[in-house]
Amino acid sequence: MIFKSQDAQKIIKHSVNMSIYNTKEQCINAAVVYQETEIGHSEEFYHEKSAFIYYIIEGEGKWIIEDVEYDVEAKDVVIVPPRKKFYFKGNLKQVCVTAPAWDEQYEKHVQFIDLD
């Protein structure tokens, strides 16, 4: 399967600009999203089914996973297993892969985050 950048769905979600390359209907095993943010993701959440795997392309920031803070920078990989709450802060460009593919019904809100 090939998914082209120009065909990606563009959205803004919780302060993050996202290009969604594919949906679960196109590939149930994984979904790929390119993300850019200047401040981070302003919602703490978890997903009941999918692991979230992030490759940091550019920038630096902080990831908060299960209330533990981790520093990240370009070329780092972050893996968040299913059912682990998380959010992130910082000026970042990154690729997120969810496996299995992200499904909205399994994403659960924990709290909104003030990133100021």
Where are these regions (language model features)?
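Short acidic-glycine-tyrosine-enriched beta hairpin
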Residues: 4, 66-83
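Compact, glycine-rich, soluble single-domain proteins
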Residues: 33-35
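A short beta-strand-loop-beta hairpin characteristic of the jelly-roll/cupin
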Residues: 47-74, 110
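Ligand-binding loop in jelly-roll beta-barrel domains
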Residues: 82-108
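A short, N-terminal "cap"/entry segment at the start of jelly-roll beta-barrel domains
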Residues: 1-31, 41-44, 109-116
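Forkhead-associated
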Residues: 37-39
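Histidine-centered divalent metal-coordination motifs
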Residues: 45-48, 86
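Short strand-coil-strand connectors
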Residues: 24, 64-68, 91
